[in-house]
């Protein structure tokens, strides 16, 4: 009798797909960071939870009737200024400065949230917790992913557990 042992490559593929998305997210946030420094203007990184889309917007210098800064989508010919995240990544928590934006909508779902990148290059404190349903663990649950944004270099660090 012979036995064949085959490695499980499906988990590696899920890791690669997830890491590719996170690399794109880091590139997008880095673009906002660089442009905020170069243009000396406020930027925001917008997460549209309904469309599963992340985009960068730049302040116009104008204010609305309530005194809030007006923003327009950042346009670049050489880089993506928005990306979609895959359906299998389910955002569970979206902490900005310690407050979970996913809990903001009373009786409904949070549709959109964002964090700022100031002209000096600093970002707000951001932590994103998600599950990856393409990466099922031995216990039958989706893999946990924690992303913590470094406010000084505008890059997410990846953890294999939820963070706060």
Each predicted region: which residue ranges?
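N-terminal helix-rich module
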Residues: 4, 10-14, 20-23, 34, ...
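Phosphate-interacting basic helix/loop segments used at nucleotide- and nucleic-acid interfaces
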Residues: 27-37
């Amino acid at each position: 009798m012979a036995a064949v042992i085959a490695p499980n490559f499906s988990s590696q593929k899920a890791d690669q797909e997830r890491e590719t998305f996170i690399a794109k997210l880091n590139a997008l946030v880095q673009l906002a960071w660089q442009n905020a420094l170069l243009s000396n203007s406020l930027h925001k990184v917008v997460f549209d939870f309904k469309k599963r889309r992340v985009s960068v917007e730049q302040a116009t210098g104008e204010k609305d009737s309530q005194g809030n800064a007006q923003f327009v989508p950042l346009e670049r010919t050489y880089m993506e200024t928005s990306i979609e995240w895959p359906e299998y990544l389910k955002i569970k928590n979206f902490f900005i400065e310690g407050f979970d934006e996913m809990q903001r909508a009373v009786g409904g779902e949070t549709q959109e949230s964002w964090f700022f990148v100031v002209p000096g290059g600093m970002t707000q404190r951001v932590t994103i917790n998600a599950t990856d349903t393409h990466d099922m663990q031995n216990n039958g649950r989706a893999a946990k992913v924690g992303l913590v944004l470094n406010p000084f270099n505008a890059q997410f660090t990846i953890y294999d557990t939820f963070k706060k």
